[in-house]
Amino acid sequence: ILREGAAWLFPVAGHSRIGLGSYAGASKLRKPLEEFLRGLDVAATRFHGTYFPAGLGAPTVGRVFAVGDSAGHCLPLTGEGIRPAVYFGRVCGELVQSAIDGRIPFDRALQAYRARVFAHRRAYAMLRALQWAVRRMPATWLGPLAEFGGRPAIRARWWPRYLDFGK
């Protein structure tokens, strides 16, 4: 569909949100999206576009906590953002509540949140490196790579780690 990106289809109350995202910052996605829609045998009713930041950004700005897209919590390679945003939002909420309750100073909550977010740097860097590699490998390698990644021994080792994000 899009070599340097991802496609999605989310059912929403009687209709669907279908889209494409580009890792390469490509902004001409309408034609590939229309081709994707034709393949699904659906017609678009409305188009909307934006960027989604993938890769950890600043978890705090001054005395403000950043969560989700504002902090770059979207996972590189997969484009998944909801689960990391919920996870980091919960961490943030617990720390803010601790500060409100007087259990920790506010500055300590900011510091603890930064530490919790930055503890995930390695995982984000690995996904970013995989994203970089996939974008540059010959198209003929993608099928065999997907088959390799789907092997039971590989899935058993890596899929639980991916699914356990934030646990």
Spans of features found by a protein language model:
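Electropositive phosphate-/nucleotide-binding environments in soluble metabolic enzymes
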Residues: 3, 26-27, 79, 83-86, ...
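Short, structured loop/turn "capping" segments at alpha-beta junctions
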Residues: 16, 42-45, 123
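FAD/FMN-dependent oxidoreductases across multiple families
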Residues: 22-101
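Short, small-residue-rich loop/turn micro-motifs
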Residues: 13, 68-70, 117
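C-terminal helical "tail/cap" subdomain of flavin- and related membrane-associated enzymes
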Residues: 97-167
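Conserved FAD-binding catalytic core of PHBH/FMO-like flavoproteins
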Residues: 1-30
